[in-house]
């Protein structure tokens, strides 16, 4: 039973995301706990929360710490809810959290993610943004090696979840690299 859900710190991106996702999923009958990330982990560990939402990279340290003490059971989001979330909020994209992420996980877990964006002011010269974007893609292997979720960095998914206009310098690279038609 999800009676007490830690939805993230007040006015945070995690709180906004968790409330959006829970709303689309039709979950309303629970007590919202507006807690910081470490406090949410403590509440889970101590049995004072039934679930906690995290909008963070994985693996996430406090959850790793909990999984050492007690099994972690991530809640999968059903496919239909993932599709509805994507329709309502196109910047959320499907993601699968591997079962090897936290101790005690017995299966891969379907969820949603927000892509990280590298933003530039319109005042930054096009050539500078082009050069940085090109360098990022030239070094994908190094980026992938730097974090467990690096494997999700692909040319095919480069623009997935992007709902804002591209900087002209980035657009130039994406067209040149045939990522953007």
What label would you give each PLM region?
Residues 1-4, 112-118, 153-158:
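Flexible glycine/proline-enriched surface loops and loop-helix/loop-strand junctions
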Residues 1-46, 141, 160, 164-169:
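Bilobed "Venus flytrap"/periplasmic-binding protein-like clamshell domains
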């Amino acid at each position: 039973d999800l009676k007490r859900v830690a939805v993230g710190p007040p006015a945070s991106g995690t709180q906004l995301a968790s409330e959006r996702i829970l709303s689309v999923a039709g979950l309303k009958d629970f007590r919202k706990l507006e807690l910081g990330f470490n406090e949410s982990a403590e509440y889970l560990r101590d049995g004072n929360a039934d679930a906690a939402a995290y909008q963070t990279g994985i693996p996430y340290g406090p959850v790793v710490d909990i999984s050492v003490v007690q099994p972690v059971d991530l809640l999968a989001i059903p496919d239909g809810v993932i599709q509805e979330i994507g329709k309502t909020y196109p910047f959320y994209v499907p993601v699968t959290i591997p079962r090897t992420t936290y101790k005690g996980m017995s299966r891969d877990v379907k969820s949603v993610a927000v892509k990280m964006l590298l933003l530039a002011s319109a005042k930054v010269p096009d050539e500078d943004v082009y050069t940085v974007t090109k360098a990022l893609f030239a070094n994908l292997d190094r980026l992938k090696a730097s974090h467990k979720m690096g494997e999700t960095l692909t040319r095919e998914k480069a623009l997935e979840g992007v709902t804002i206009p591209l900087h002209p310098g980035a657009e130039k690279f994406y067209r040149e690299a045939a990522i953007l038609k």
